[in-house]
Amino acid sequence: AGTRISSSWIRNVVSEGDLSLASASLGRPYSLCGAVTHGKEMASGTLKCPTANISADALQLPPYGVYAAWIVCGGSPPVPGIVYIGDAPTIRGEGNGHAIVEANLFGCSVDLYGRDISVIPVRFLRGSITFPNPEALSRQVARDVAAAKSALECKE
Protein backbone atom coordinates (compact mmCIF):
# COMPACT_ATOMS: atom_id res chain seq x y z
CA ALA A 1 0.00 0.00 0.00
CA GLY A 2 1.15 3.53 -0.74
CA THR A 3 1.34 6.55 1.50
CA ARG A 4 -1.99 7.97 2.60
CA ILE A 5 -2.02 11.60 1.57
CA SER A 6 -3.86 13.86 3.99
CA SER A 7 -3.73 17.56 4.81
CA SER A 8 -1.61 16.80 7.89
CA TRP A 9 0.80 14.74 5.79
CA ILE A 10 1.11 17.62 3.27
CA ARG A 11 1.72 20.13 6.10
CA ASN A 12 4.46 17.90 7.47
CA VAL A 13 6.10 17.51 4.04
CA VAL A 14 6.04 21.31 3.57
CA SER A 15 7.47 21.97 7.05
CA GLU A 16 10.31 19.55 6.24
CA GLY A 17 11.02 21.51 3.04
CA ASP A 18 10.18 18.85 0.45
CA LEU A 19 8.25 21.21 -1.82
CA SER A 20 8.62 18.94 -4.87
CA LEU A 21 6.86 16.11 -3.04
CA ALA A 22 4.22 18.51 -1.70
CA SER A 23 3.55 19.82 -5.22
CA ALA A 24 3.40 16.32 -6.73
CA SER A 25 1.02 15.18 -3.97
CA LEU A 26 -1.19 18.25 -4.34
CA GLY A 27 -1.32 17.88 -8.13
CA ARG A 28 -0.31 21.55 -8.45
CA PRO A 29 2.61 23.70 -7.35
CA TYR A 30 2.80 24.36 -3.61
CA SER A 31 2.21 28.09 -3.16
CA LEU A 32 1.89 30.83 -0.55
CA CYS A 33 -1.06 33.10 -1.32
CA GLY A 34 -2.26 36.38 0.10
CA ALA A 35 -2.88 40.07 -0.37
CA VAL A 36 0.20 42.30 -0.66
CA THR A 37 0.61 44.45 2.45
CA HIS A 38 2.90 47.31 3.43
CA GLY A 39 6.12 46.36 5.18
CA LYS A 40 8.88 48.46 6.73
CA GLU A 41 9.87 49.85 3.29
CA MET A 42 13.48 48.92 4.05
CA ALA A 43 13.75 46.52 1.10
CA SER A 44 12.91 49.21 -1.44
CA GLY A 45 14.94 51.89 0.38
CA THR A 46 18.14 50.69 2.03
CA LEU A 47 18.38 47.35 0.23
CA LYS A 48 17.29 48.59 -3.23
CA CYS A 49 15.28 45.39 -3.65
CA PRO A 50 11.55 46.20 -3.42
CA THR A 51 9.38 43.38 -2.13
CA ALA A 52 5.73 42.36 -2.19
CA ASN A 53 4.93 41.25 1.37
CA ILE A 54 2.14 38.87 2.31
CA SER A 55 1.09 37.89 5.81
CA ALA A 56 2.39 34.51 6.90
CA ASP A 57 -0.10 34.18 9.77
CA ALA A 58 -2.40 31.57 8.21
CA LEU A 59 0.14 29.91 5.91
CA GLN A 60 1.88 26.55 6.20
CA LEU A 61 5.49 27.62 5.77
CA PRO A 62 8.49 25.66 4.57
CA PRO A 63 11.79 26.06 6.49
CA TYR A 64 12.89 29.67 6.91
CA GLY A 65 15.23 30.95 4.24
CA VAL A 66 15.57 32.29 0.73
CA TYR A 67 14.04 30.56 -2.29
CA ALA A 68 14.04 31.04 -6.04
CA ALA A 69 10.35 31.46 -6.87
CA TRP A 70 7.71 32.20 -9.43
CA ILE A 71 5.15 34.84 -8.50
CA VAL A 72 1.67 35.00 -10.02
CA CYS A 73 -0.67 37.98 -9.80
CA GLY A 74 -4.19 37.45 -11.10
CA GLY A 75 -4.26 35.86 -14.54
CA SER A 76 -0.85 37.23 -15.50
CA PRO A 77 1.97 34.87 -16.49
CA PRO A 78 4.33 33.87 -13.66
CA VAL A 79 7.17 36.33 -12.97
CA PRO A 80 10.55 35.03 -11.77
CA GLY A 81 11.72 36.25 -8.41
CA ILE A 82 13.17 35.53 -5.04
CA VAL A 83 11.30 35.05 -1.78
CA TYR A 84 12.42 35.33 1.82
CA ILE A 85 10.42 33.37 4.38
CA GLY A 86 11.30 33.99 8.01
CA ASP A 87 11.35 36.42 10.90
CA ALA A 88 13.89 38.89 9.41
CA PRO A 89 16.26 38.95 12.40
CA THR A 90 18.63 41.55 10.90
CA ILE A 91 15.85 44.07 10.34
CA ARG A 92 13.38 43.20 13.11
CA GLY A 93 15.63 41.82 15.85
CA GLU A 94 16.35 38.28 16.99
CA GLY A 95 13.52 36.13 18.25
CA ASN A 96 10.62 38.39 17.25
CA GLY A 97 8.69 35.21 16.40
CA HIS A 98 6.62 36.76 13.63
CA ALA A 99 7.22 35.23 10.20
CA ILE A 100 6.95 37.21 6.98
CA VAL A 101 6.88 36.31 3.30
CA GLU A 102 8.68 38.88 1.11
CA ALA A 103 8.92 38.41 -2.65
CA ASN A 104 11.03 40.43 -5.07
CA LEU A 105 9.71 40.12 -8.62
CA PHE A 106 12.49 40.45 -11.19
CA GLY A 107 11.88 43.25 -13.68
CA CYS A 108 8.44 44.11 -12.29
CA SER A 109 7.61 47.59 -11.03
CA VAL A 110 3.81 47.27 -10.87
CA ASP A 111 2.12 48.50 -7.66
CA LEU A 112 0.80 45.29 -6.08
CA TYR A 113 -0.46 46.69 -2.75
CA GLY A 114 -3.82 45.14 -1.90
CA ARG A 115 -3.68 42.66 -4.79
CA ASP A 116 -3.63 38.91 -4.26
CA ILE A 117 -0.48 37.09 -5.32
CA SER A 118 0.68 33.49 -5.27
CA VAL A 119 4.33 32.81 -4.48
CA ILE A 120 5.60 29.45 -5.72
CA PRO A 121 8.96 28.65 -4.10
CA VAL A 122 10.83 26.21 -6.33
CA ARG A 123 14.42 26.03 -5.05
CA PHE A 124 15.82 26.55 -1.57
CA LEU A 125 18.89 28.81 -1.83
CA ARG A 126 19.99 29.34 1.79
CA GLY A 127 18.76 29.45 5.36
CA SER A 128 17.84 32.58 7.29
CA ILE A 129 20.90 34.48 8.51
CA THR A 130 21.37 37.38 10.94
CA PHE A 131 23.67 39.97 9.33
CA PRO A 132 25.83 42.45 11.25
CA ASN A 133 24.35 45.42 9.34
CA PRO A 134 22.04 46.31 6.42
CA GLU A 135 25.02 46.66 4.04
CA ALA A 136 26.07 43.03 4.62
CA LEU A 137 22.45 41.97 4.07
CA SER A 138 22.33 44.01 0.84
CA ARG A 139 25.47 42.29 -0.50
CA GLN A 140 23.97 38.88 0.27
CA VAL A 141 20.65 39.83 -1.38
CA ALA A 142 22.58 40.62 -4.60
CA ARG A 143 24.17 37.13 -4.46
CA ASP A 144 20.76 35.58 -3.74
CA VAL A 145 19.19 37.34 -6.73
CA ALA A 146 21.97 36.05 -9.01
CA ALA A 147 21.51 32.50 -7.65
CA ALA A 148 17.73 32.69 -8.13
CA LYS A 149 18.08 33.95 -11.71
CA SER A 150 20.42 31.06 -12.45
CA ALA A 151 18.07 28.52 -10.80
CA LEU A 152 15.09 29.86 -12.75
CA GLU A 153 17.13 30.16 -15.96
CA CYS A 154 16.33 33.85 -16.37
CA LYS A 155 17.83 35.43 -19.47
CA GLU A 156 18.70 38.84 -17.93
Give the residues covered by each predicted segment.
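Anionic-ligand-binding alpha/beta catalytic cores of soluble enzymes and soluble regulatory domains
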Residues: 3-52
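Phosphate/ribose-recognition catalytic cores of enzymes acting on nucleotide-derived substrates
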Residues: 1, 39-156
